[in-house]
Amino acid sequence: MNKGELRTHFLALLNRSDCTDALADTFIDQAIGRIRRTLRIPSMEKQQTYSVTSPGGLSKIVLPADFLEAIDTYYDGDALVRLPLHEMLAYQKTGGLGSPRYFTRELGTFYLHPQPTGGTLYLNYYSELEALVADSDINALTVVASDVIIYTALGYASDYFLDERGQLFDGKAAVFLAEVQEQADTAEQSGGTQVMRPTTTYED
């Protein structure tokens, strides 16, 4: 559904003559803001590539403007491990160069250690949802979870209008949200056998 279709369906389900289009849009925006805080689905995933050409070492990278949450970060096929900020600051004082093994986020920046001088760094992340401005606009959420948006918005509308159907709307929104997340989680695990790994390995 696009924004206009979401609004039309929302207003039909709410079935109130005192809810304007502007109010409906506010409830829909509130719903999207709430959903994005918890839902993590493949259609929200993006990849940012950083080509490193810094003879003196690259100490940090700037995160994409639509960055919401990191999935993984890797360099030359090796995943980086996240460290607490105080440990990273201690490492960075050494100024070591080489393939990065660790990262730390501070505001809109990832700090790296060791500091790479070349190669390619990859960041897989969950992105913010595109804003719905025009009635024809869609985003990753409207395509796969329009019912979650609509019923979450109906919950906000019920609070505003003191509508007794609020609990019903919230309950349906929670069920739909769980279904979408479960479908995404199942798809993530499909196609291979899950194997138990030992916590410790020993070499001869």
Feature-to-residue mapping (PLM):
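Glycine-enriched, solvent-exposed interface loops adjoining structured elements
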Residues: 1-204
